[in-house]
């Protein structure tokens, strides 16, 4: 080969070898850097054949298999209702009866575990059965108190002349507590199972804002405090009916685990077997009403899949 031609080829090949060396070094460095990032931000799954698969790290309250638990406190409101009473010697209805909740005065009872059932509280435990969809077990401990200072419409019959005489012009005044005291204060317990859909609204390094909405269905397990016609007060737990609700919440999650939850819900309660005496007589009451509730509290969420 002609010597000038060989010199030209040599001059052309030297830069190409240098570029190839730089490219290989760059690829090795980028592989190291991105490999380190994968280990810290992704899920690593090893297979039997030695292949390692990397999956994106999921947001909190978003992925199948995630779990959360929550405890909080509520305020409730109730529509007026008709309450029908039946028993030995009476069958009557009080119409358009008003009621309210009974929140406990702010104090140590809200954080003392030995007193937690005294306050109006909520508990939730949720499991994500698929991405962004959770099955949620809930206990809503509300308190329902009939307003004593009211006069209500009366229809029906009472055989006892003492209490029949308290009905004047188709109405009865409840203010003196002689005719009736009626409350579910230990409490108006709504044990429910719900489905909730979750959507991540804001995702930052250590903070997530997540919106959820859903519906629930359950049974009513109140401890009703009822005193009718001076009888012994009924005060016992009993499955009295059913309830259903629609709910929506905002969840602030910090460092992927700790959460603050604020929720609003509206629902319907129908109780057809409220015990009104301590014995096993057929004395009972029934009522149905619409309720609203706002609640807030703290919780914790975690993944059942582990990260590197």
Regions found by a protein language model. Give the residues of each.
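Bacterial Sec-dependent N-terminal signal peptides
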Residues: 1-44, 308
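Short glycine/proline- and aromatic-enriched beta-strand/turn motifs that initiate or cap beta-hairpins
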Residues: 37-127, 293-295, 299-307
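Extracellular loop and loop/strand-boundary signature of outer-membrane beta-barrel proteins
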Residues: 55-57, 108-111, 177-183, 228-237, ...
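Gram-negative (and chloroplast) outer-membrane scaffold detector with strong preference
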Residues: 60-65, 124-227, 299-304
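Residues that define the transmembrane beta-barrel architecture of outer-membrane proteins
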Residues: 63-67, 117-121, 185-191, 209, ...
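Outer-membrane beta-barrel translocator domains and adjoining extracellular loop/strand segments
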Residues: 81-87, 148-154, 223-232, 273-281
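Predominantly the C-terminal beta-signal and adjacent terminal strand-loop region
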Residues: 81-84, 90, 249, 253-308
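Flexible, solvent-exposed coil segments and beta strand-coil junctions
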Residues: 98-106, 169-177, 224-230, 274-279
């Amino acid at each position: 080969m002609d010597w000038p031609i060989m010199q030209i080829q040599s001059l052309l090949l030297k830069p190409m070898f240098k570029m190839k060396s730089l490219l290989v070094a760059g690829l090795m460095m980028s592989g190291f850097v991105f490999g380190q990032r994968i280990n810290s931000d992704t899920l690593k799954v090893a297979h039997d054949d030695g292949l390692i698969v990397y999956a994106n790290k999921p947001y909190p309250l978003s992925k199948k298999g995630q779990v959360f638990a929550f405890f909080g406190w509520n305020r409730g409101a109730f529509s007026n209702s008709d309450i029908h009473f039946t028993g030995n010697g009476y069958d009557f209805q009080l119409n358009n009866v008003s009621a309210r909740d009974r929140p406990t005065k702010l104090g140590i009872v809200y954080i003392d575990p030995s007193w937690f059932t005294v306050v109006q509280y909520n508990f939730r435990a949720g499991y994500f059965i698929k991405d962004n969809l959770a099955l949620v077990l809930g206990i809503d401990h509300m308190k329902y108190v009939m307003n004593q200072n009211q006069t209500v419409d009366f229809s029906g019959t009472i055989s006892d002349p003492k209490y029949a005489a308290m009905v004047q012009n188709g109405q009865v005044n409840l203010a003196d507590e002689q005719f009736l005291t009626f409350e579910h204060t230990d409490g108006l317990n709504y044990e429910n199972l719900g489905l909730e859909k979750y959507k991540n609204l804001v995702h930052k390094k250590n903070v997530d804002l997540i919106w959820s909405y859903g519906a629930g269905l359950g049974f009513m397990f109140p401890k009703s405090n009822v005193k009718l016609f001076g009888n012994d007060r009924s005060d016992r737990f009993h499955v009295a009916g059913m309830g259903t609700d629609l709910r929506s919440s905002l969840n602030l999650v910090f460092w992927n685990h700790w959460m603050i939850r604020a929720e609003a819900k509206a629902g319907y309660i129908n109780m057809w077997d409220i015990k009104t005496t301590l014995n096993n007589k057929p004395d009972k009451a029934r009522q149905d009403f619409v309720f609203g509730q706002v609640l807030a509290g703290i919780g914790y969420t975690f993944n059942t899949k582990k990260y590197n």
